[in-house]
């Protein structure tokens, strides 16, 4: 095909191809530089004592175990609350809602909420959950704020996954006498589970990397608390702790060490999402 091109068109095609490769190379180089720089500055400080210890200005020790646990608490609580809401809303919008105008309005609202800066969710969460409902800054207020923030993402990703299921599957199940819910439960959801799981894992990644919404709602506490105590006690996550140490003079190396841990977690979460989605899609295709 390229042999039939004129020299001018061939030169233009070569120039555009080179430009595309250059853009791709610069993007990869920037990503590798960012990861390498963070690991170079922070990874030497990631020790077992750093991961399993607690911070104390009196003893002059630094540890991020409380922040790791607070992050885990918020991830578990937020996902436990948002999954039934998000998946249920997506099933209703895709399978049950009859008024398309209402569906389009809700879809527009979810897309709009997805684009709102997270700091605004944090401000609203502080005013409503912390002050109005008197929950105090802690894991519970932070989790509820994140539920509101990531709910549109769960709804949209689940909707898109449900829409990929062929309509013939639904018609076949209904023709065999299955009820509406039985058809959704036994036919639609199993064929859409790969996209739903991938969306949930990516939502976990967003929770782990969130800081702005938690500054006002989860607090800055670096104290080790159990789950029940942390619900209503100031509990800094890894990202909030990174912010605290980055603004503390002389603690920049600690901030880079936390950034290294967060970078590893992000890479693991994204890799898990990719592998899980691929495996579930492969298993779904072989059934």
Regions found by a protein language model. Name each.
Residues 2-22, 37-78, 99, 244-253:
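Periplasmic/extracellular loop-to-transmembrane helix junction in inner-membrane transport proteins
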Residues 55-62, 214-263:
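Interhelical loop and adjacent transmembrane-helix boundary motif
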Residues 69, 73-81, 85, 89, ...:
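Hydrophobic alpha-helical transmembrane segments of multipass integral membrane proteins
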Residues 78-110, 123, 273-282:
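Transmembrane-helix boundary motif in ABC transporter permease subunits
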Residues 79, 158, 180-218:
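Transmembrane alpha-helices
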Residues 93, 159, 163, 201, ...:
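C-terminal transmembrane helix and the adjacent membrane-cytosol boundary/short C-terminal tail
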Residues 111-148:
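Generic hydrophobic transmembrane alpha-helix motif, especially the helices
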Residues 117, 176-177, 190:
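Glycine/proline-centered hinge or cleavage motifs at structural transition points of membrane proteins
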């Amino acid at each position: 095909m390229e042999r039939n091109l004129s020299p001018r068109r061939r030169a233009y095609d070569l120039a555009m191809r080179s430009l595309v490769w250059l853009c791709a190379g610069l993007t990869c180089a920037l990503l590798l530089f960012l990861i390498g720089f963070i690991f170079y500055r922070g990874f030497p400080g990631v020790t077992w004592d750093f991961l399993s210890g607690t911070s104390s200005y009196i003893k002059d020790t630094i540890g991020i175990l409380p922040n790791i646990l607070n992050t885990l608490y918020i991830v578990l609580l937020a996902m436990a609350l948002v999954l039934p809401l998000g998946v249920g809303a997506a099933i209703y919008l895709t399978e049950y809602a009859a008024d398309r105008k209402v569906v389009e309005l809700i879809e527009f609202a979810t897309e709009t909420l997805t684009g709102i800066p997270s700091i605004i969710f944090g401000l609203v969460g502080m005013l409503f959950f912390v002050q109005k409902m008197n929950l105090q800054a802690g894991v519970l207020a932070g989790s509820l704020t994140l539920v509101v923030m990531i709910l549109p993402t769960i709804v949209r990703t689940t909707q898109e996954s449900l829409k990929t299921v062929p309509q013939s599957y639904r018609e076949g199940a209904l023709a065999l006498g299955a009820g509406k819910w039985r058809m959704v439960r036994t036919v639609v959801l199993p064929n859409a589970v790969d996209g739903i799981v991938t969306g949930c894992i990516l939502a976990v990644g967003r929770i782990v990397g969130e800081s702005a919404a938690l500054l006002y709602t989860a607090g800055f506490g670096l104290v080790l608390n159990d789950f029940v105590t942390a619900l209503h006690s100031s509990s800094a996550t890894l990202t909030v702790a990174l912010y605290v140490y980055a603004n503390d003079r002389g603690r920049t190396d600690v901030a880079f060490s936390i950034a290294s841990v967060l970078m590893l977690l992000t890479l693991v979460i994204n890799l898990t999402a990719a592998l899980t989605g691929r495996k579930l899609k492969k298993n779904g295709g072989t059934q």
